[in-house]
């Protein structure tokens, strides 16, 4: 059972209780602490749009602790990060793997961070398909196209050569925070 902590805020008007995530949102902090799926994407996208509408000059921070997940859900968040006017800072706490690493690298240049004991992992997209040969061929082409898209993204965000990215992403490629900084996924270790 997941228990969500509540905090109590005292004001001149009295006390008000918030679940911790709502309280963090008041400080323009969004938490991603699970696998990427459509529910997470809808929640985070709505939070980004809300914070941008509330103040389109003030940075938004996204803290990431995720094993990865759905690329379509992750790209919905990434596209919204690029769409909103405020800079979006990304901070890895724990792990940013797969789609989590893409989102981490997708933060505003100069504002991508990881805590010192964080772990970052990149790899080629995963997929499984059943069905007729034609369906499997369509799915394989889609995954290859997605892999090339991810390689281009990391090339643009890290400066790593495409050939190095192809080789590194052939299997799970793990980095600690300092290695992720040297690789160009993040800008600083906190």
UniProtKB/Swiss-Prot annotation:
InterPro entries: ClpP, ClpP/crotonase-like_dom_sf, ClpP/TepA, ClpP_Ser_AS
UniProt superkingdom: Bacteria
Gene Ontology annotations of biological process type: protein quality control for misfolded or incompletely synthesized proteins
EC number: 3.4.21.92
Catalysed reactions listed for this entry: Hydrolysis of proteins to small peptides in the presence of ATP and magnesium. alpha-casein is the usual test substrate. In the absence of ATP, only oligopeptides shorter than five residues are hydrolyzed (such as succinyl-Leu-Tyr-|-NHMec, and Leu-Tyr-Leu-|-Tyr-Trp, in which cleavage of the -Tyr-|-Leu- and -Tyr-|-Trp bonds also occurs)
Pfam family, one: CLP_protease
UniProt entry tagged with the keyword Protease: yes
GO cellular component, one term: endopeptidase Clp complex
Any one Gene Ontology molecular-function term assigned to this protein's record: ATP-dependent peptidase activity
Active site, per annotation: 98, 123
Quaternary structure and partners: Fourteen ClpP subunits assemble into 2 heptameric rings which stack back to back to give a disk-like structure with a central cavity, resembling the structure of eukaryotic proteasomes.
Protein name stated in the entry: ATP-dependent Clp protease proteolytic subunit 2
Lineage: Bacteria, Bacillati, Bacillota, Bacilli, Bacillales
Gene assigned in the entry: clpP2
